[in-house]
């Protein structure tokens, strides 16, 4: 029998907690015998004193096991269970293309996603722009759609990693969100509760990233790779660029529109194509569906070219309550803003930098993201047709198109976009889309 206050004291003093102590504390969080004050105290102790990798594995597994862990054996799927998680950014609509592409290559992707957080867009908010699409379903429906379509993207259900929900709510209001040990546990407990065989992490770097520096992003990627593999799930990570908006658009309906156009081949932004292909290839190799990068990319290009990936996206949408003709009539089904107008630069030159975070906040300011937890979103607003880093800017060349509902919204978004896009006389060096891969061998 342990005492919560003694576990807190031990961590406060910088000692490593045993697996049994961590399991006891997480069980207490799950059954409400440990209160918010004690959760907050342990979170702050971990923030200052950190956790060893063994402690992080124990925390992640205890949080994973605090609720239901999905099993897939009884479905006889005939393919590996594999997923991707992104630390979030602006215009990061990768999941909507990646899930169907990997499914079309023989993987099964049970993706449990999140809502928008701060300046970053949430995959669930994007899917909510599709009429009828249900992001909150029971586990039976989730398993059924994964089996039939090969992919389902839904929100966290109450019975998956419930301890994480309580811990996160306390971290959010006690300035302990930034602990890499606790971020690792929070991300992985939810992902591993899906019963994955392989996971690929997309850790963002740059002005629109969650982690403030390249070093912090690298540290998070290494922590996740070490802990996930320690918990028995084959995991690698890619560090990808978020120094500019990833897609051509940022918002909810506007990003779904771009995802559909990508899958059908109507338009593929080269940056998001590079990141999506790199992550998908990593997933196929990790899951044993391709032997190397070349084979993986050939398979992925084939399912884009033959329409199989697009067909699977349509099947997932229908399976989760969306329109049966969504892929054919997506433009009809997705909401549109009242005002769609360009914003121009005040002077000419080259785009030298972008405050990507500020561009995300411009979408939030128009109602496309949340200021408070219960906010209702306007799915139609957003930004599209972004200029890229290094492009030349003239007086008649728009920085972006603004999709707003009122003139007031348009004016505010326009000034935020103009402030966020830095213009100078010298063209900057091009940044890579993918900086590096981190696997077990790199730890």
UniProtKB/Swiss-Prot annotation:
GO terms for cellular component: cytosol. Its EC number is 2.4.2.4. It holds the Pfam family PYNP_C. GO terms for molecular function: 1,4-alpha-oligoglucan phosphorylase activity; thymidine phosphorylase activity. Pathway: Pyrimidine metabolism; dTMP biosynthesis via salvage pathway; dTMP from thymine: step 1/2. It catalyses: thymidine + phosphate = 2-deoxy-alpha-D-ribose 1-phosphate + thymine. Keywords: Glycosyltransferase, Transferase. It comes from the Bacteria. GO terms for biological process: pyrimidine nucleobase metabolic process; thymidine metabolic process. Coiled coil: none annotated. The enzymes which catalyze the reversible phosphorolysis of pyrimidine nucleosides are involved in the degradation of these compounds and in their utilization as carbon and energy sources, or in the rescue of pyrimidine bases for nucleotide synthesis. Belongs to the thymidine/pyrimidine-nucleoside phosphorylase family. Homodimer. This is Thymidine phosphorylase.
